[in-house]
């Protein structure tokens, strides 16, 4: 699963997930893309699960790009531990997603196949998504 090789600090503050995705909102690599229309957090497991659904459906055809990376650690205290005594240990990693962020891209397949594959992948994700095509200027 995806996670940073090394970070400057082990733990991060929770923070806020506000605003719209200004970067990573255009289809840059592939022909078709799955774009987020809601805000939320994607865990490394969810990203991997959707990637597997995509690759299984397109089989050997096409190339897939993952445009998000889980770089924020989420901590959790062990079960039945009293409050206090410091912050818990890192449990998993998440990517913070704003509306308009491109999550996955694909090329080398038909539009119909891409739509089917992205529908399967979107079912694995906790966010509302939409199918977008690359616009040629």
From Swiss-Prot:
InterPro entries: Ribosomal_uL16, Ribosomal_uL16_bact-type, Ribosomal_uL16_CS, Ribosomal_uL16_dom, Ribosomal_uL16_sf. It comes from Pseudomonas syringae pv. tomato (strain ATCC BAA-871 / DC3000). This is Large ribosomal subunit protein uL16. One of its GO terms (cellular component) is cytosolic large ribosomal subunit. Keywords: Ribonucleoprotein, Ribosomal protein, RNA-binding, rRNA-binding, tRNA-binding. GO terms for molecular function: rRNA binding; structural constituent of ribosome; tRNA binding. Part of the 50S ribosomal subunit. Binds 23S rRNA and is also seen to make contacts with the A and possibly P site tRNAs. The keyword Transport does not apply.
